[in-house]
From Swiss-Prot:
Record EC number: 1.15.1.1
Species annotation: Brassica juncea (Indian mustard)
Catalytic activity: 2 superoxide + 2 H(+) = H2O2 + O2
Protein name: Superoxide dismutase [Cu-Zn] 1
One GO cellular component term noted in the UniProt record for this chain: cytoplasm
Alphabetical keyword list: Antioxidant, Copper, Cytoplasm, Disulfide bond, Metal-binding, Oxidoreductase, Zinc
Enzyme class: oxidoreductase
Role according to the record: Destroys radicals which are normally produced within the cells and which are toxic to biological systems.
InterPro entries the UniProt entry points to: SOD-like_Cu/Zn_dom_sf, SOD_Cu/Zn_/chaperone, SOD_Cu/Zn_BS, SOD_Cu_Zn_dom
Tissue: Ubiquitous.
Amino acid sequence: MGKGVRVLNSSEGVKGTIFFTQEGNGTTTVTGTVSGLKPGLHGFHVHALGDTTNGCMSTGPHFNPEGKTHGAPEDANRHAGDLGNITVGDDGTATFTITDSQIPLDGPNSIVGRAVVVHAEPDDLGKGGHELSLTTGNAGGRVACGIIGLQG
C-alpha cells in the first residue's frame, strides 16, 4: 500500500490536508478537508509539476501523460489529473473522498512530487463550450496548492 499526503496553504487563507492512499496496483483514494473557500464548487486537479517557486502558477498544466483533452473524472478522454470538483459548504469547508485509477503513487505515471491544486471556480468538465473548457475546465485561478509527498 502506498500513502501520500499534502498540506495546503495559500496567501488567501485557504488551508487543508489531503491524503492519497493506493492499495497494491489498484485505484488511489483521495480524502481531504479544505477550508477558507467560498461556498460552491471548486475545480480540483493534479498538476504536472511539483514546483511552487512562483506560488501555484509554477505547477504547470494538469497532469496529462497521455496527451488527452480535459474532461470529467468518469470520461475515457481526460487528463489523468482531472479530478472534477470539490463541494464547499456555507462554512467555507469541503470534506471529500475521491477514488481514481489514473493517479498512482508509484510507477512511471506516479503523482508523487507533482502538485494538487484547488481552483477558484467550478470545473466545467470539458463541456462548457468556453475556449478553456478542453484545457483547464475553465476553473479559474489557482487559490491553493501543494506538492504531493510520500507518507510513512
